Curated annotation (Swiss-Prot):
GO terms for molecular function: RNA binding. This is THO complex subunit 5B. Residues 285-332 are annotated as: Disordered. The keyword RNA-binding applies. Its main location: nucleus. The gene is THO5B. GO terms for biological process: mRNA processing; mRNA transport; RNA splicing.
Length: 819
């Protein structure tokens, strides 16, 4: 808007309309008496907005200047109305404030009265609480209950009006009864004092008689020796054993006391005796006492010499430096395995037979190494190698070769193990029985880990055993291990004679199956004790890549051959573990067995028996671990090769699982079967039997070969039967374990061999041609609990195979199953 226009449209006081223009003012009606100031304010505001809008529109058009003046006049009138409404609102506000001030006075008065009442109430509450908390002395007086008072109080103290008396009247009467009772007790005490004097005189006379008894008892003991030997009481022998036990070193004494307490408290089927030279033990005890007294005197004298000033050195204090050991003394290892003269011999009997002398399972000999400060145990009279050492891996990661604590490692030297030629070894559980607690040793990278949630991983598995019944747990495991090895030896003897062991189990289908194949050979190949017991991380990293590319860009890996044979994702659970059977130069037992044993190491670490099924909480963990292994293996999609960081993250324990294979034995099993067409099938199995049998089941690695009647190979390749062999391995190594009852766990090897023979018979009897074996569903694929009635069902879809192989969840055979 231009300035000229503004000046032209301004309205001054001289230009206010004359009385003739009052007709325009009458357009806006005055304030109606029924309207409130707020409504008048709103109407005036709305009218002003409308007038301003009209003036702006006329100003833009440039004409109707007379109308603009009229609108301006109306707007001023609205301003007057606005001021009038504002004045009315302020007047009403003052009126409301005055009314509020008048109403505030009674409210303040009422509030003051309320505060006074609340203060008075709090005063009364405090007074009531003080009265209630008041304690008098009479409740602390130890009086007889009221019922006893009414029952036993004499009539002189109580009267007939007691039922209506108040508690205040009753209390003095109860106090009088208490005084009466105490007087009676004082009289009774005087009588007891008289009896005590007479009894003391009698005791003195009997002590004189007892002092003369040892001479009579000594002569009586000598006379009773023939009777003791005849009755088998051996009381004198027990006293001698206790006297010998006093000369035992502290670790052996703790071991002896624990075993003896277990026998006496729970009637354990064991016998204890301390053997050795008594004179040598006494001489060693005197030598140790003189050595200890000499060390204490030398310590005191050296302390005095160190505290006294030297005259030649102007009173300056001089300390003695310890003498350095010569290299000859430091390198002398001849006396490291020096044994204490006394040993503990433990006879363990079968606890399932009532007569303890009917069957002696094993004899243990405990000895103490003086220089190494460890307790060793071994089977008495046993000169066998580690493959027959029943104490090897009695608990996880305890082969007996590693020094049990750090001081022993320092004495033996870095990287040195215990002498393997010794039959007795320092197992960790023996140290715990002897009271020698072993602290866990942290590695370099573990020492910097301060996470308390991960601190439990550093504690050895034997710490769980420390919180349980030590002696009972060890004896039970030794009995189970010995019985299992006796049953295993019986089965191995039959297999060496090329005879299949007989199993007695009605629930197992292979027990009722008539074996058609023949056992050609059973040979003992080697023992894993001769191998190295260490598995470095480099060996874990040297897993073959799924495919390698040569200079020409061609694949030179063997895994592609297997991938081309099977369908996409079919049976992926065992492909990686068994791919090295044909692609590497190692034997199947050397490669696949190690891979599978590491998978099974998790399952049997803290189990009492893998075949106890629902009878113990440990079997639930075993079934969970089986599912864990199958689920983990079934998801192998990425390449087998891993980076170093990935291996260290996912496999931190694989480098320490070499103890699993220590002491295990490997056998070669060959089944043969000749078909009607003149074709000869041979199923070769590498069987690895662990020292923890049957806790850790035997591991089977299979390979299949076929030849014609003329003896020539017919061109069959193991990859043609790859899926079936892996399914058989999974069945024999994992799934069939669920159906074996607990009373047959020691004959697990027989069940596995019988099951393998049955699967081999079914596979050979399969009428499908060789070209369709890899693409057809056989009895091996779908499981033995739901047979396919001898028919071959071709898969109707491609893609990853999510079938669960040979499930044994149902024990009953379906109709048509060839049991």
């Amino acid at each position: 808007m231009e300035d000229g226009e503004i000046e032209e449209g301004m309205v001054t006081a001289d230009e206010f309309p004359t009385p003739e223009v009052t007709t325009i003012e009458t357009i806006q009606p005055p304030r109606e008496p029924g309207k409130s100031p707020l409504e008048l304010l709103r109407e005036s505001k709305t009218s002003v907005e409308e007038i301003v809008a009209k003036m702006l529109s006329m100003k833009k058009q440039g004409n109707h200047k007379s109308e603009i003046r009229e609108l301006l006049t109306q707007m001023f009138l609205n301003f007057v109305n606005l001021r009038q409404a504002n004045r009315a609102i302020l007047t009403e506000e003052d009126k409301v404030k005055a009314e509020t001030e008048r109403a505030k006075a009674p409210v303040d008065f009422t509030t003051l009265q309320l505060h006074n009442l609340m203060y008075e109430k709090s005063h009364y509450v405090k007074a009531i609480k003080a009265c209630r908390d008041f304690k008098s002395k009479y409740p602390d007086i130890d009086l007889v209950p009221e019922q006893d008072f009414f029952r036993h109080a004499p009539e002189a103290i109580k009267d007939q009006s007691l039922s209506s008396d108040s508690s205040h009247v009753l209390m003095p009467k109860r106090l009088n009864f208490e005084l009466h009772q105490r007087k009676e007790l004082c009289k009774h005490r005087a009588r007891l004092e008289q009896q005590k004097k007479s009894l003391l005189e009698t005791i003195a006379e009997r002590k004189k008689f007892l002092s003369s008894l040892p001479l009579h008892l000594k002569s009586l003991k000598k006379a009773s020796l023939p009777v003791q030997n005849h009755l088998g009481i051996q009381h004198t022998k027990k006293l001698k054993q206790h006297n010998l036990a006093e000369l035992l070193p502290p670790p052996l004494y703790v071991l002896y006391s624990q075993l003896l307490a277990q026998k006496e408290a729970f009637e354990e089927s064991i016998e204890l005796e301390v053997v050795g030279s008594l004179k040598d033990a006494q001489a060693y005890a005197r030598q140790q006492s003189r050595k200890d007294s000499g060390m204490s005197s030398n310590t005191e004298s050296s302390r005095l010499e160190d505290d006294g000033p030297d005259d030649d050195d102007d009173g300056q204090r001089r300390r003695k430096r310890p003498k350095k050991l010569t290299s000859k003394e430091g390198s002398d290892k001849a006396g490291l395995y020096q044994v204490h003269p006394l040993k503990i011999v433990l006879h363990i009997y079968d606890d399932e037979i009532p007569d303890t002398k009917s069957l002696k399972l094993v004899i243990l000999k405990f000895e103490y190494l003086l220089k190494l400060n460890v307790v060793c145990v071994g089977a008495e009279g046993s000169q066998d190698g580690p493959e027959k050492n029943i104490f090897c891996n009695l608990f996880p990661d305890d082969a007996g070769l590693e020094p049990p604590h750090q001081s022993t490692k320092l004495i033996l030297g870095d990287g040195q193990t215990f002498d393997e030629n010794r039959t007795s070894r320092p197992y960790k559980w023996v140290q715990h029985l002897a009271g020698i607690d072993i602290s866990p040793v942290l590695l370099g990278q573990e020492a910097h880990n301060t996470d308390p949630a991960k601190s439990d991983t550093f504690v050895p598995d034997l710490s769980l055993y420390r919180q349980q019944h030590r002696v009972q747990t060890v004896l039970r495991r030794i009995r189970l291990r010995k019985k299992a090895h006796l049953a295993l030896a019986e089965q191995l003897d039959l297999l060496m004679k090329h005879e299949l062991p007989v199993v007695n189990c009605e629930d197992a289908p292979w027990a009722l199956h008539k074996v058609l194949c023949a056992l050609d050979s059973w040979l003992h190949i080697q023992s894993s004790a001769s191998k190295s017991c260490s598995l470095t991380l480099n060996s874990v990293e040297q897993v073959p890549e799924p495919m390698e590319i040569d200079v020409d860009g061609r694949s030179i890996s063997g895994k592609e051959d297997f991938e081309s044979i099977r369908e996409d994702g079919e049976l992926p659970s065992l492909v990686t573990a068994a791919a090295s059977l044909t692609s590497s130069n190692h034997t199947p037992s050397k490669v696949s067995n190690q891979a599978r044993s590491r998978q099974l190491a998790l399952m049997t670490k803290n189990l009492d028996s893998p075949i106890s099924k629902g009878k113990s909480p440990s079997f639930k963990k075993y079934e969970d671990d089986l599912d864990l292994v199958l689920d983990d293996d079934s998801e192998i999609d990425e390449p087998t090769g891993r980076t170093e960081a990935h291996v260290e993250e996912l496999c931190p324990e694989k480098a320490d699982n070499s103890w699993v294979d220590y002491g295990s034995r490997e056998f070669a099993l060959v089944f043969s079967r000749k078909t009607d067409g003149g074709k000869l099938w041979k199923l070769e199995a590498m069987v690895q039997i662990s020292m923890e049998y049957p806790l850790r089941p035997p591991l089977f690695s299979l390979s299949l070969h076929a030849s014609s009647s003329s003896g020539n190979e017919n061109g069959t390749n193991e990859s043609d039967h790859y899926n079936e062999l892996r399914a058989m391995e999974a069945e024999v190594n994992l799934h069939m374990l669920k159906i074996i009852p607990s009373d047959q766990e020691n004959y697990l090897l027989s069940h596995q061999i019988r099951c393998l023979a049955m699967l081999f018979d079914y596979y050979v009897d399969d009428p499908s041609p060789d070209s369709k074996r890899g693409t057809a569903t056989t009895v091996v694929d779908v499981g033995l609990c739901k047979p396919v009635d001898g028919k071959l069902l071709v898969r109707s879809f491609r893609g990853r195979d999510h079938r669960k192989m040979i499930s044994w969840k149902g024990r009953g055979c379906a109709s048509g199953y060839p049991c």
